[in-house]
Amino acid sequence: MDKAMLRNIPKVDELLAPTHALCPDASAAAVTAAVRRTLDALRESVLSGEAPEIPETAALCALAADAARRAETPSLRPVINATGVVLHTNLGRARLSGRAAKAAADAAEHYSTLEYDVESGGRGSRNAHVEALLCRLTGAESALVVNNNAAAVLLLLTALTAGGEVVVSRGELVEIGGSFRVPEIMSACGATLREVGTTNKTRAADYAAAIGEHTRALMKVHTSNYRIVGFTESASREELAALAHSRGLPFFEDLGSGSLFDLEAFGIHGEPTLQGSVRAGADAVTCSGDKLLGGPQAGILVGKKSCLDVLKRHPLLRALRVDKMTLAALEATLRAYADGSAVSTLPTLAMLAASPEELRAQARTLCEKLTERGISAEVLAEGDAVGGGSVPAQTLPGFAAAVTPRHCRVDELAERLRQRETPVVARIAHERLLLCLRTLRPEEYDELVRAVAESDR
């Protein structure tokens, strides 16, 4: 340890003004904290013998200013999604429509009718804001919203199957991420999982053979994040609903992603709709709000009134209920389906509906802008993905602007783009950076081009 070096470390007060001059938008508190952390780190380096010398004051101020800027940069902030993955789980899944975002902001900023009945002047139900819409759109007798689909399944099984058995196909024992698995959730709900059939083949007769005195329900789980192909067979929801009802049991279906729109129109196959499950006879259907539905994070339950009334009275519901902003955004999203504007106004559906011709034209436009800045870019046909644990094994025909960096490696370019104030997240393939058009908005092009130009150095 060099005591002379310790004495040469500047005092906090000496660095405050010059540091603040480098980051004038930072608060005084952030600058002071950053200067202290910078000097503390330097002191530790001297004590450990790692610092060969004391840096110049200007260098210390630059380090502190950078730390102050980082400290005041919001952790949760907008991202430019150039991955072509529409429901990117790590980037927040579904983007809200302008109408839904405004509804959420209004609910946050103002007092609201969250649990207030304007007719009677008494207490109302927060579920009432979306229940009628959900019933109208799905044909269900009743509806309920909780904070995500995992919560919806948890509430459903806890309230209606605790202490009994639930019959599920072995081929549908899914994990949806974060170690949230059907067998574990059954155990947590106090129910016993009764597996039937095999991984690739399960028939209605397998369910029938498993029904006994302890059976509380038959359940079908849509394998939204994987597919079993080849020599396969599964019981239809219609078969299972009829079987369950013939034995005096309820039939549940967990759709996972869930949809209110027939995605076959976009060339996306195998995704059932909520209304289809209701028509098939399901007593309760669950799905997510922030995936194919295109709304906020929520768990949606629709089905028979007799089932959902039990859920509405269960004490667990209070722990799983949604807030006013979620309800406002969900109501606005559902109204888009009700008035027929969903495909044109909900970003998720609009992105899924984008044709290859539209995307190719957009890719040409972006490449022209990139070329004008001296960036090497060309239009490249590339497959996009739905994402969000939805529609596995299907790619959407898309186009990208493929950038070949001139002054750095492609991985360095990608890293620099990620670290910008507004991060740009893209893909790397064929030794080029791919900017996929399906998930980009035209109003983002100029900022994206500037980001690439400034990062390719």
Question: Where are the regions a protein language model picked out?
Answer:
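Glycine-rich phosphate-binding segment of PLP-dependent enzymes
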Residues: 35, 40, 82-83, 93-119
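Conserved C-terminal alpha-helix-loop-beta "cap" of PLP-dependent enzymes
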Residues: 356, 360-441
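Conserved PLP-enzyme active-site core in the AAT-like
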Residues: 120-337, 370-371, 451
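Structural motif of enzymes handling amino- and sulfur-group chemistry
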Residues: 306, 314-315, 322-370, 382-383, ...
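Long amphipathic alpha-helical segments
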Residues: 1-68
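Short Gly/Ser/Thr- and Asp/Glu-enriched loop/turn motifs at secondary-structure junctions
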Residues: 9-10, 80-84, 293-296, 396, ...
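Long amphipathic N-terminal alpha/beta scaffold segment
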Residues: 51-96, 100-103
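A short linear hydrophobic-aromatic micro-motif
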Residues: 75-76, 143, 287, 422-427
